[in-house]
Amino acid sequence: MKVKILKKKKIAIVSIYDLGNFGNRLQNVAVYKLLKNLNYEPEVIPVDIWSKKKYITRPIKNFFNIFKIQIGSARRLSFLDFNKNIKISKYKLLLKSNKEVVNHSLSDVYDYFIVGSDQVWNPEFAGFGFYFLDFVKDNRKKIAFSASIGVTDISKEFANKMQLNLKKFNAVSVREKQANDLITSLTGRDDITTLVDPTMMIEAEEWNELARKPKQYNGENFILNYFLGEQSEERRKIINDFAKKKGYMVINILDKDDPFYASGPAEFLWLEKNAKLICTDSFHSSVFGILFNTPFLVFDREDTSKNMSSRLDNLLDIFGLKDRKFIGKELTENRLDIDYSKAHERLAFEKKRGVDFLINAIGGVEE
């Protein structure tokens, strides 16, 4: 089979745009890099979800004003600096209170529209139609790339919304088997593909090039403590007791009182690679543990009313790492031992599947 990349296509990436979330920024960069590596011309369209109701599109004059970023925040500046790794569209999606027709059609600017990755179809975020690409004209391709729902329970109203919109997509891939089963059931489609997160389709060496040692690091061995949900005192004590026993310091990267709170995605990558152990309830923190061969332990999230564990359970299952789930009341030495050989064999296979999906969805393969 002869593979040929066609004339460069201009592609819009629509995803959650959070200048404060490591995983979100890293998946955004991953999708962008994958498309660039395939010789396409991607641009990320920022989404302003802070205004109301209906959206319009308009050129950006001052990128900083969109997100009301406080320039004095070292952490925000670190995130902004990392954003230099992607090309931002001069247009943004902006919610508006009235239902006027959009004043600029993005369908006249881009050839393809890709939504994903991340939890773009989580009911908490996807109430906004742009994550279903409902602003895109029918003569443009709509592609979902490793999209996630993030929860296992959705309302009937939201299920109907998914059913209506996803039937119109030209190609759909999701990040979890549970999402695949749900969408297949809702739409009757038999072509839904389950892929790993795009961050796993980028080589570790390429992530290494983006990593940066935090200025605060003093050379001590450390445990990276990264919890998106609430962390109980009991869990903190388990981790701190083990760190004390080993002579490690604990870096609480999301604690505003921790010096490492100023870290951006580049510093996060370095910490993930160099930690002696990662303790987390985060999907992307676990992903980079696998990519960097760093020992990690997954804790169930304690403070959520909806089931948020499907993504992590699916990840551990695919890569044969179910033993990375922490159960118990004590951390022991053997949790630092991990064999990634089989996981990386599977990783190579999954990377190829992801790239093949993009090429076929966009139309870059010629017999």
Show the residue positions of the predicted features.
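Active-site anion-handling motifs in enzyme catalytic cores
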Residues: 1-367
